């Protein structure tokens, strides 16, 4: 069954997303650091969840570098490929994990995110939370540089506001 969602603009970007997205924390194939809270799931189940979410009308998936050390992002890519979905069919949001890291690490991290999610584009790249060895201002400056290189479509923050 497909629900009819009115799509909304993602922040100030031209990207349109449904009001409900699919969270991909569990798509980490046993590499999830936090199995005490909930268990990660296998590839077959991940593929089915992604397929059913898109059939239901959801057009974006939220994942992060920190979810299974990139395994969630790879699972999202495989699930989208298994469902024969193209880059424009689903929007992808992922996040940089800044804890105990410096803003100068962002370019290296985005290269890994791009590889993990290939062949799909990153529609939204976010700072996952505000705690870092670098100020949020320095982190955002690096995010803007990456956006200006057209490696990602938009930038933002998660779990805090600017």
Which residues does each predicted region cover?
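Glycine/proline-rich, positively charged
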Residues: 33, 38, 100-162
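Short, solvent-exposed loop/turn segments at secondary-structure junctions
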Residues: 26-27, 97-99
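Structural preference for beta-strand elements that scaffold enzyme active sites
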Residues: 17-21, 59-60, 89-95, 121-126, ...
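N-terminal binding-site loop/beta-alpha segment at the start of enzyme catalytic domains
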Residues: 1-90
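Short strand-loop junctions, especially beta-strand C-caps/beta-turns
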Residues: 64-66, 95-97, 130
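Residue-level signal for alpha-helical context at structural boundaries
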Residues: 79-82, 94, 143, 161
């Amino acid at each position: 069954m497909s629900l009819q969602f009115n799509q909304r603009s993602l922040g100030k970007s031209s990207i349109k997303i449904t009001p409900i997205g699919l969270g991909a924390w569990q798509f980490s194939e046993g590499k999830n650091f936090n199995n005490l809270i909930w268990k990660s799931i296998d590839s077959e189940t991940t593929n089915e969840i992604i397929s059913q979410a898109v059939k239901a009308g959801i057009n974006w998936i939220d994942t992060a570098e920190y979810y299974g050390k990139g395994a969630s992002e790879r699972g999202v890519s495989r699930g989208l490929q298994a469902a024969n979905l193209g880059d424009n069919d689903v929007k992808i949001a992922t996040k940089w994990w800044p804890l105990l890291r410096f803003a100068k690490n962002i370019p290296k991290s985005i290269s890994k995110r791009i590889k993990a999610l290939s062949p799909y584009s990153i529609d939204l790249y976010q700072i996952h939370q505000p705690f870092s060895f670098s100020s949020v201002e320095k982190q955002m400056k690096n995010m803007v540089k990456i956006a200006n290189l057209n490696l990602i479509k938009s930038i933002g923050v998660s779990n805090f506001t600017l």
